[in-house]
C-alpha cells in the first residue's frame, strides 16, 4: 500500500507549480515576519534555518531568506523539487541547500538549526509523532520552531471533512461536480443559471468565476484530494510539545489577504479566539512558535 505522505507529495507538486502563477503565491512568500512571530527585529540575521516539507516552490524558504537568514536548508520527499526551487530562489544563490528526505527521519545532525519552519505538513503524515520528535532533535537548544497544523472542530471543517469529502469519495455525481469546479469548468453551467435566473444567472457565474479563482480552486484540491488531513486540538498539541521539550509555546496571529471567497474567513486567522471564529472554524489553522528548552 502506498504511503499517504508520498501520495500527498505527488499531489502537491502539481498544486504548488500552478500556485506560482496565482496571487496566492505572493501571499505565501510573505506569511512570516519578525513582527507577527513576536520576535526581535533582524532575528533571522546569521541564523541557520530549515524549511521542512518545503513543497515544490520553496515559498517558506524564500520568506526566510528575504528576512535575512544566513542559510536555509529545504527538504521534501522527491527530487522533482530541485528545478523549480532553484529557479524561485536564484536571487539567493549560495545561501540555500536542497535535500530529499522525510520528516520521520530528517537528514540532519542533532542540534543543527537555529530555526525550523514546518507549515501545513505534519497533519499529512502517517506518523506525526516522529515528525515532532525529529524537529526537536535537529533544533539547537534555545532554537525556535514555527509549526502550522490543521485545528479541530468548527462547522466549516465538519462540513468539509464529514460531508463533502466522504460524498466526493462515494458519490460519482458529487465527484464530477467538484472536479469541474476545481478544474475551472464553471462556465459549463452558464446555461443552467441563465435559464433559471436570466441575467442574474450570468452575473452569478461571473461572481463564482471571480471569487472561486485559481488560488481557491487549488486550496479545494488540497483539502479534497489529500488522503490524510489530521486535525489537532490546540491544548493537547501544546501539552505534547511541552513533553518533548518544545516549550514557551504561543500562538501566532496572522493577517491573511485573500482575493477570493476565502476573504470571508480571513479574520478568523487573526481573531482565532472570537466567538464567530470558534463556532465556524474551531481551533482553526493552528500556527504556533515554540522554543527548545532541553
Tell where the protein language model's regions lie, with residue ranges:
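N-terminal, positively charged/glycine-rich alpha-helical extensions of SAM-dependent methyltransferases
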Residues: 1-22
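A short acidic, Gly/Pro-enriched loop at the edge of an enzyme's catalytic core
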Residues: 104-115
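Conserved class I S-adenosyl-L-methionine
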Residues: 47-55, 145-202
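Class I SAM-dependent methyltransferase SAM/SAH-binding core
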Residues: 57-105
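Acceptor-substrate binding/catalytic loop of class I
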Residues: 153, 220-236
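A short glycine-rich, Lys/Arg-flanked "PGG" loop and its adjoining helix->strand segment in the class I
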Residues: 129-141
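Conserved alpha-helix/loop element of class I SAM-dependent methyltransferases that forms part
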Residues: 24-46, 63
Amino acid at each position: 500500500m502506498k504511503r499517504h505522505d508520498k501520495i500527498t507529495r505527488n499531489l502537491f507538486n502539481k498544486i504548488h507549480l500552478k500556485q506560482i502563477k496565482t496571487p496566492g503565491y505572493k501571499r505565501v512568500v510573505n506569511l512570516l515576519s519578525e513582527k507577527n512571530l513576536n520576535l526581535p527585529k533582524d532575528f533571522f540575521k546569521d541564523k541557520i534555518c530549515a524549511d521542512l516539507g518545503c513543497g515544490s516552490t520553496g515559498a517558506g524558504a524564500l520568506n526566510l531568506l528575504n528576512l535575512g537568514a544566513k542559510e536555509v536548508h529545504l527538504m521534501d520527499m522527491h527530487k522533482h523539487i530541485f528545478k523549480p526551487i532553484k529557479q524561485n530562489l536564484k536571487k539567493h544563490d549560495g545561501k540555500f541547500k536542497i535535500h530529499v528526505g522525510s520528516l520521520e527521519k530528517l537528514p540532519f545532525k542533532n542540534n543543527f538549526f537555529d530555526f525550523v519552519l514546518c507549515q501545513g505538513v505534519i497533519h499529512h503524515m502517517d506518523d506525526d509523532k516522529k515528525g515532532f520528535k525529529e524537529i526537536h532533535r535537529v533544533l539547537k537548544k534555545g532554537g525556535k520552531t514555527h509549526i502550522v497544523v490543521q485545528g479541530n472542530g468548527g462547522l466549516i471543517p465538519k462540513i468539509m471533512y464529514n460531508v463533502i469529502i466522504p460524498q466526493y469519495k462515494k458519490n460519482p455525481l458529487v465527484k464530477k461536480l467538484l472536479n469541474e469546479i476545481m478544474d475551472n469548468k464553471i462556465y459549463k453551467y452558464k446555461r443552467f443559471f441563465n435559464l433559471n435566473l436570466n441575467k442574474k444567472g450570468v452575473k452569478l457565474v461571473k461572481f463564482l468565476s471571480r471569487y472561486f479563482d485559481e488560488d481557491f480552486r487549488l486550496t479545494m484540491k488540497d483539502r479534497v484530494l489529500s488522503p490524510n488531513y489530521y486535525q489537532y486540538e490546540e491544548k493537547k498539541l501544546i501539552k505534547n510539545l511541552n513533553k518533548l521539550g518544545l516549550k514557551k509555546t504561543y500562538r501566532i496571529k496572522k493577517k491573511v489577504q485573500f482575493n477570493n471567497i476565502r476573504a470571508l474567513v480571513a479574520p478568523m486567522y487573526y481573531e482565532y479566539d472570537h466567538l464567530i471564529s470558534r463556532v465556524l472554524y474551531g481551533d482553526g489553522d493552528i500556527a504556533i512558535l515554540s522554543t527548545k528548552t532541553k
